[in-house]
Amino acid sequence: TPGLTITGPCEMMVFEGLPGSAFDCWKDILRPDQRLTKACELLRRFVPWEAELCQKVKLTDEQATLQGSYTPVVKKPTFRLSYGKPVLGLGDSILLNDPIGGQGANNACQSATFFLNKIKEHESRLFTEEWMQETFETYWKQSAQWATKWTNLMLKPSKSFVSLLRAASHQPNTANWLANGFDIPRKILTEMDLNE
């Protein structure tokens, strides 16, 4: 992935690992140079054709690496401010999916649009905590649950989904259809037949 750092343009690598997998190895690797060494080892082991492209890779600076973990969660969508008024959260403040599914910005945009439309429909009535909870539940059923299912499918792909990914690697129409599924996971998931 192309990037820009304080020292200029660069190419970035992202490694994600399920707990207990070979890629779940970063917790005790603290120094950036050690992280780069481990990244190159993983490339050589799992994707040697990519490792060939990284033979001369080097860090741009001492802050060139970032490590962390991510716990997907659906939070309570409402919160009470210190003076008692309820507020409705949206996007990552209430719904966290693993980044592998590419749904963070998608959920933020879709929830903002959905909630705005519901606010307009509600007109001048009170925006109670109950209304906010119901609005979120409707959003979950119509949109957000599909983003979560899509992300979970990426994390633990079925054999059928792996076959679909393989097909997309050499069939442009399938690749385009699959890539467009990131925008509207509900549409693509209802179109896919991934029965094992």
Per-region residue spans from a language model:
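Conserved FAD/dinucleotide-binding core of flavoprotein oxidoreductases
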Residues: T1-G68
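Short, solvent-exposed loop/turn segments at secondary-structure boundaries
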Residues: W26-D28, I100-G104
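FAD-binding beta-loop-beta segment adjacent to the flavin cofactor pocket
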Residues: Q67-L95, P99
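C-terminal helical "tail/cap" subdomain of flavin- and related membrane-associated enzymes
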Residues: T60-A64, R80, G101-Q103, L116-E196
